[in-house]
From Swiss-Prot:
GO terms for biological process: L-methionine biosynthetic process from homoserine via O-succinyl-L-homoserine and cystathionine. Its main location: cytoplasm. GO terms for molecular function: homoserine O-acetyltransferase activity; homoserine O-succinyltransferase activity. Belongs to the MetA family. CDD domains: GATase1_HTS (cd03131). The record marks S192 as: Important for substrate specificity. The active site is at C142, H235, E237. Transfers an acetyl group from acetyl-CoA to L-homoserine, forming acetyl-L-homoserine. This is Homoserine O-acetyltransferase. The keyword Iron-sulfur does not apply. The keyword Zinc does not apply. Its EC number is 2.3.1.31. It catalyses: L-homoserine + acetyl-CoA = O-acetyl-L-homoserine + CoA.
Length: 314
């Protein structure tokens, strides 16, 4: 089923060229079904790229989805034109009285900083607090997952000895979890980070389930038992060339990074990487929308005001 978006959003041209099903507002309004309302808090500097990546995956789900974008007003974007932000993004003050079936909190290139030193940290914690009564299920990605665990459960991130970058094998630890419906026993996906959270901290400080993990990546996917909190430390949404662009960016600024693992054929950066995680990515996002959101969210989203006991950090 399609996603419904502003007709002027630049990502639409890319998505239509890939034969992604986009529905205009006239057609959407004639369907006798309540669309899912999803808010994307986009913390990535390359906003338009991340928009396209996430919308591509949401468009593969079997439901009509209305998508809105949120940005942190306390942070000035250096890589996205102000006109784009003003046209397609909303501030927290503009959405704080609304309700959503799902919230996606993206990663951000700030993981080597203490959380409290991130310039929009206080505003982000307001969003986390607000989501208790205004969002049914929240999907936290990469740094967004670490930020959510830190604020909601007191689980801090731990530095790795070197950057984890590449395509890594992960094992499904809970095949009975709805998020893993349709997955094989193992899958691969991109990871790109300098920090991690430990299994010991998750066991000692939360009652979250470890849904997937890997020998090289450690914890990969965590979830609350009712799927209203979902944490993914990888990057299912990454394009074929995203890690390549990150690698070349790091080279240009003199970081001298290792070649991303299991990515370039023959570890040769001049070769085009193989796309090996697309099916797992589509399955994961479809499962989140269907099982964590659609099957359980109230028809009247205002009812979320009356039922927020699922958050263990209240």
């Amino acid at each position: 089923m399609p996603i419904k978006l502003d007709n002027k959003l630049p990502a639409l041209d890319v998505l239509r060229s890939e034969n992604v099903f986009i529905m205009d507002e006239n057609r959407a309004s004639s369907q006798d079904i309540r669309p899912m309302e999803v808010l994307i808090l986009n913390l990535m500097p390359t906003k338009e790229v991340t928009e396209t990546q996430l919308l591509r995956l949401l468009a593969n789900t079997p439901l009509q989805i209305n998508v809105e974008f949120l940005y942190m007003a306390s942070h000035k974007s250096k890589n996205t034109h102000a006109e784009h932000m003003e046209t397609f993004y909303k501030t927290f003050d503009e959405i704080k009285d609304k309700y959503y079936d799902g919230l996606i909190v993206t990663g951000a290139p700030v993981e080597q900083m203490p959380f409290e030193e991130v310039d929009y940290w206080q505003e982000l914690t307001r969003v986390f607090d607000w989501s208790k009564k205004h969002v049914y299920s929240t999907l936290h990605l990469c740094w967004g997952a670490q930020a959510g665990l830190y604020y909601k459960h007191g689980v801090d991130k731990v530095p790795l000895s070197e950057k984890l970058s590449g395509i890594y094998k992960q094992t499904v630890d809970m095949p009975e979890n709805f998020l893993m419906n349709g997955f094989d026993d193992s899958f691969v996906s991109p990871h790109s980070r300098y920090t991690e959270v430990t299994l010991e901290d998750i066991k000692n400080k939360t009652d979250l389930d470890v849904v997937a993990s890997g020998q090289e990546v450690g914890l990969s996917i965590l979830a609350s038992k009712d799927l209203r909190e979902v944490y993914s430390f990888g990057h299912f949404e990454y394009d074929r060339d995203t890690l390549a662009r990150e690698y070349r960016r790091d080279l240009e600024v003199g970081i001298n990074p290792d070649v991303p693992a299991n990515y370039f054929p023959g570890d040769d950066p001049s070769q085009e990487p193989k796309l090996r995680w697309n099916l797992a990515a589509s399955t994961f996002f479809s499962n989140w929308i269907n099982y964590a959101v659609y099957q359980e969210t109230p028809y009247r989203l205002e009812e979320l005001e009356d039922d927020f006991s699922f958050y263990g950090y209240l």
